[in-house]
C-alpha cells in the first residue's frame, strides 16, 4: 500500500494535480491536465514500475539529468482517476 501511494503521488505531480484542483460538474469530479510529463534524475525505479504496468511511457534517450522524461498513458490516467475518484481528460483531447 505504501508503494501504491508513492506511484499515485508521482502520477499526480506528472499531470500537475498536486498544484491545480479538479472541477465539479453534475456532481462528478473532473480534471484537465495542463501538462503530462515528468523528468527524472538517475533514480527512475518508481517510473519504471509504472511503465511495466502500462501506466506510463518514456523517451528512449536520457535527459540532461541522467534520467528520462516520462508521461502517463491513457491507461495511467484512467488508473489514477480510479484511485482518486475523478475523471482525468487527456491533455491532447
Model region roles, listed by residue range:
Residues 36-58, 67:
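Short amphipathic alpha-helical interaction segments
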Residues 61:
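Conserved catalytic-core motifs of GNAT/GCN5-like acyltransferases
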Residues 65-93:
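Short, amphipathic alpha-helical interaction segments positioned at domain boundaries
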Amino acid at each position: 500500500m505504501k508503494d501504491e501511494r508513492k506511484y499515485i503521488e508521482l502520477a499526480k505531480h506528472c499531470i500537475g494535480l498536486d498544484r491545480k484542483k479538479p472541477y465539479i460538474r453534475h456532481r462528478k469530479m473532473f480534471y484537465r491536465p495542463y501538462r503530462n510529463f515528468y523528468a527524472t534524475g538517475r533514480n527512475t525505479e518508481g517510473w519504471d514500475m509504472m511503465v511495466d504496468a502500462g501506466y506510463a511511457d518514456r523517451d528512449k534517450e536520457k535527459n540532461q539529468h541522467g534520467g528520462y522524461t516520462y508521461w502517463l498513458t491513457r491507461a495511467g490516467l484512467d488508473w489514477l482517476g480510479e484511485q482518486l475518484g475523478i475523471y482525468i481528460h487527456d491533455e491532447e483531447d
